[in-house]
Amino acid sequence: MKQEFFNLKINTTGQRLCEFTDQTIQWINNNKFKDGMLNLSIQHTSASLIVQENADPDVQTDLINYFDKLVPMNNKFYIHTTEGKDDMPAHIKSALTNNQISLSIKNNELLLGTWQGLYLSLIHISEPTRRLS
């Protein structure tokens, strides 16, 4: 079984969803992967990876708004605030989502649905760079 490793660096600003589908497809094409599994992971405790609709940007807005209501930033019960008011909410939101995704590659093509995209979910406001492996 062939195994390759790569890092993808994404520069970010604020809480948002950053799509990285195109960069992933480009990496698959550049490395001529025909068939197999792609395992993506993020080595941060305040960000996550999701597969989500990429056709309508309102989906991203609604997801962010929902998570902000579910896990509010200014909760007086949070004890852990080492990195600011968004620190503990970021940890909770990342615990509710994924830090790893496994996807299939068939005939050199990433198998995603018509409207699916790969997203880095930025939960922590202040970190400017994220690395995916």
Question: Predicted segments — roles?
Answer:
Residues 16-63:
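Active-site beta-strand/loop microenvironment that shapes enzyme catalytic pockets
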Residues 41-43, 106, 121:
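Short beta-strand segments
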Residues 123-133:
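Single conserved hydrophobic/aromatic residue that forms the stacking wall/gate
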Residues 2-12:
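Short amphipathic
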